[in-house]
């Protein structure tokens, strides 16, 4: 049976409402407005109204983002220069006290010098879901269309050129058959589609496999990050405090480490990252996390506290050599979907924001030229690699590989 589907035409479609895509959408609307103002003043032809849409599978923007992160603000200052002023952005606290420990089963050794990659002076502890929600509000105020509960199901092609995305059908039973409340997904057509759907995004996997965008790259390597939010009875771990640890509960052959971040209202974010390339098949990352909480450093910290949220997510930690070709005809890949995470620094938000801005600049050029081919969009690959965040990833290109030796 052929299903009739509604078609929605956009100029730019962004799949996933994370930091990369939201920064892209916001920066693009600002760039288009600036371009049209200059064109009007100079007598040139301005662009027609540009329709930008963000689709997100979650019920609310930010609800699939796990709280707790340390933000390097350098790229956010480029996107929104005043974000630190007047309490505009939902920042938990500037990083204050920092410690790095090597843990044994019952003891700890403080590192006398914090490794440069883990120094966070000048950075901010943030709640990522609050930050993303705030960025979404900025986008909507700028005229971006944001559609929550619209998961992307499959790419739409003309030959090998991407022309949009089909959203998921609703009202399907467990066997795949339509129920009485069946609603077919929508075909959203766009001149440029930007995939920023997070690590191992389903559409990015389809695209990379079909167009062989990972040819000549190393296979991506993943870690799983397990974290909890605890509400404490007192201010024993002030907002802005940061701890990172190595060692227990992981053995010397397993890639990973832990963190504790102090947030507002006596909440702490505590987590453990475990490389999924572990050698011992008996390792269970969730069990390792429970062991981690039995260490005296952590158990004493959590005493009397209340668990208020739990979550886990995969992280792409393979680095520079695992990143795919990020553009093809009509499409771009950014953020975690493209492996834009610095595993050495445990940071990716600032990289995602800059990638979104560079993608927006490339899309503006494509809109002006009315050219959405790989030949035009590949400028993004080049801009990203030449940028400060690209150089940062290149500098740490062998970090994970060093653990395999």
Write out the residue ranges for each language-model feature.
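Beta1/beta-strand and adjacent pyrophosphate-binding region of the FAD-binding site
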Residues: 4-20, 53
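N-terminal FAD cofactor-binding segment of flavoenzymes
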Residues: 27-31, 38, 45-106
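Glycine-rich phosphate/pyrophosphate-binding beta-alpha loops
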Residues: 125, 337-350
């Amino acid at each position: 049976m052929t299903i009739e589907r509604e078609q929605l035409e956009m100029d730019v479609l962004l799949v996933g409402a994370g930091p990369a895509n939201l920064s892209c959408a916001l920066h693009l609307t600002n760039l288009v407005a600036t371009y049209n103002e200059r064109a009007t003043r100079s007598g040139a032809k301005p662009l027609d109204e540009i329709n930008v849409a963000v689709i997100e599978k979650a019920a609310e923007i930010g609800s699939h983002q796990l709280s707790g992160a340390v933000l390097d603000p350098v790229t956010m200052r480029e996107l929104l220069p005043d974000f630190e002023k007047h309490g505009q952005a939902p920042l938990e606290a500037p990083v204050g006290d920092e410690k790095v420990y090597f843990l044994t089963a019952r003891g700890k050794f403080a590192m006398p010098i914090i490794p440069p990659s883990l120094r966070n002076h000048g950075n901010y502890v943030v709640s990522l879901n609050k930050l993303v929600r705030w960025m979404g509000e900025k986008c909507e105020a700028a005229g971006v269309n944001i559609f929550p509960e619209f998961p992307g199901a499959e790419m739409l092609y003309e030959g090998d050129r991407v022309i949009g995305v089909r959203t998921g059908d609703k009202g399907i039973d467990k066997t795949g058959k339509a129920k009485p409340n069946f609603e077919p997904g929508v075909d959203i057509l766009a001149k440029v589609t930007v995939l920023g759907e997070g690590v191992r995004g389903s559409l990015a996997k389809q695209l990379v496999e079909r167009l062989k965008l990972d040819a000549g790259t190393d296979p991506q390597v993943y870690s799983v990050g397990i974290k909890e939010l605890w509400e404490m009875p007192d201010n024993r771990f002030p907002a802005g405090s940061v701890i990172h640890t190595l060692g227990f509960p992981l053995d010397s052959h397993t890639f990973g480490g832990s963190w504790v971040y102090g947030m507002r209202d006596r909440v702490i974010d505590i987590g453990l990252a475990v490389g999924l390339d572990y050698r011992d098949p008996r390792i269970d990352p969730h069990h390792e996390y429970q062991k981690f909480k039995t260490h005296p450093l952590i158990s004493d910290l959590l005493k009397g506290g209340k668990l208020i949220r739990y979550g886990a997510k995969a992280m792409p930690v393979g680095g520079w050599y695992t990143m795919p070709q990020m553009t093809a005809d009509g499409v771009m890949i950014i953020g975690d979907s493209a492996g834009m995470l610095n595993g050495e620094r445990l940071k990716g938000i600032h990289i995602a924001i800059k990638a979104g801005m560079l993608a927006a600049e490339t899309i503006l050029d494509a809109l002006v030229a009315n050219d959405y081919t790989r030949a035009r969009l590949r400028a993004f690959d080049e801009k990203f690699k030449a940028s400060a965040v690209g150089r940062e990833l290149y500098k740490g290109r062998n970090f994970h590989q060093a653990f395999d030796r």
